[in-house]
Swiss-Prot record:
Protein name: Telomere length regulation protein TEL2
Gene3D superfamilies, A to Z: Telomere length regulation protein 2, C-terminal domain
Family the entry assigns: Belongs to the TEL2 family.
InterPro entries in alphabetical order: TEL2_C_sf, TEL2_Regulation, Telomere_length_regulation_dom
GO CC annotation terms, alphabetical: chromosome, telomeric region; cytosol; nucleus; TTT Hsp90 cochaperone complex
Gene: TEL2
One BP annotation, GO: telomere maintenance via telomerase
Protein species of origin: Saccharomyces cerevisiae (strain ATCC 204508 / S288c) (Baker's yeast)
Alphabetically ordered keywords of this record: Chromosome, DNA-binding, Nucleus, Phosphoprotein, Telomere
Other comments on record: Present with 638 molecules/cell in log phase SD medium.
Amino acid sequence: MVLETLKQGLDSSQIHEALIQLDSYPREPVDLDASMVLIKFVIPVYPSLPERSKVILRRLASKSFTFLCQIVTFSRTISGRDGLQEIRIYQEILEDIISFEPGCLTFYLKASTTSKADRDSIKALFFGSKLFNVLANRIDMAKYLGYLRLQWKFLLESNETDPPGFLGEWLVSSFLLNPVLAADMLLGELFLLKESYFFSFQKIISASSLIDQKRLIAKFLLPYIQVIVTLENLNDVRKILRRFDLDKIISLSVLFEIQSLPLKEVIVRLMSNHSSTKFVSALVSKFADFTDEEVDTKTCELLVLFAVHNLNHSQREEIAHDERFLNGVTKHLGSNEREARERAMFIAKLLSGGHLKYESDFKINIPNVKFESNSDDKIIDFQSLKNPSICNTQTDVGKDKITEVSGHVQSLTLDCSDSDDEDENDEREIVKRIVFLKDLMKEYEKTGESRKAPLIPLLKQTVKLIRQKADFQLEVGYYAQGILSSIVCLNNEFDEPLFEQWRINALTSILVVLPEKVNGAINILFNSELSLQQRMSLLSALGLSARELRGLDDPTIVKPKFDFPTNRLPWDDQSHHNSRLVEVQESTSMIKKTKTVWKSRKLGKDREKGTQNRFRKYAGLFFYPLAHGWLNGIDVGTYNQLFKSHYLTTLRIIYSCANPVHDFESMTELMNHIISSAIEEGISLNKG
């Protein structure tokens, strides 16, 4: 009867009475039939309804998953310019439901405990992007995650004594929406906010499947903690991690991925002796292989941590006499690298209990933090976990303007002199106040209607913050991939004349500060849906970052210098080669005070040659994926010749920067083959 009444086109007071009747039903008040009537006859007038009626309508949706699903499904069928106003109404009510009704997820959960199909539908709607995709041009991902945080908060406060195991699966899906932003929202602003929330988080993980436990801890919790860990909160981090069964969750690959040495030590010290012996056996095998310097450094570091903290005297002696370990020592001693030989002897001396006589000042330093004996009894200080720091030629092709970096592009600066627009200046002030990378990333997540301001101020701030925080590798590394991906996928929506140059500058800054992120950049190049302009800009950034890492200067790249002192942790001190550079600078400043009588030209040449070559270590990461990409075939459509010419230019720049590198001959052979194929295809070689 109520549904038939609603179909007649009622006024607001009559609609209100009908909604009250629906809300009074004891069971699910809105089934499929009722949903369709409300969608067709009530929701279209939602903006004009009085607030009291809106509240009831939202409450009906919060009690009926069927109703919410039908709103989402119907919204997706609306298309075309004529439906623009209509879709906005449905978007408005959907956003109001998830923001003003924080208990809807909890209600749906309780109603679906016996049906896996229903649970999967809820997961797909909230955490599988179905709902977000409908709202995408109205709200950004950061705002959506904020709404999900409200839903999870209500769920935690509903005092479920035994959370169902599938909640861990839902939580994993929540993080996967945007791993970095979700970690900030859900961990930093909810689960690690106070003991009651963390206890619920702990119960959810404990009830989850082992694979979900590993993902929640290793893929989301540990990377987040790694960024916020300090000497002051290290004990609180230890008390958090000891709540979980790390022996089951932690693998050797996880330990290798962790860059924070103090966090690595905390995890090792929380592991049992039984698990430690298994890890050490695997580490000894890696030590014996010794194929990669970087992997070996981490292997030896972990061996020291386990030996010092988790192994007894007899276990250390057993390893010292292990045939694999002895073969590894022999292999290390035959290395041309002095540090490899020193590492092997340091560990051999440690495992032998000092009986091995070998004089050397070399040490593998570990934090070896001392915790108070009664510290386990103290509560976790969640306040200490607050994260304060997370933080050129032009070619017209049809209507698209393809910008390519060359030495003729004007020099760029970070000042505000290149715009007279007052609104842009206001936006610049807002962006300039961003000091944390997490806030920068939130700005990049803005899309559609939430993107109302020019992008150049944001790109400038990216250059400034990334280069300013160059010494904060953990923080920059945590946010870099998300920011890099967002920058590549930006469109010049406001037709800003220097947009591409600033995009390239921002990408170059990330790749120079964290060259290992080139893997992610190339993956985006090959596997993402990008426009021709986006691909060209990314290629330009790859070439320019290779040049800067090689020590070469380009006037198109902004390299701001900052007086940004860092209170570094005692185990995170600058490497010894930096101290040597300081000594040289001090000596130079003393020489300047004297009068120069005669100076050889060779002195100037030596100074030029002193430029540090950081590219050598990463040359293969830059060159080989691009080279093999060419060999696998490139086809971007109409402008394939233009793109391949720019691609080849980038590859030649990277190749020239790679010399000297140990496999330069194989690079040369591959490069010659690529150039030959380019000549056969008629690709221009006279650029670059």
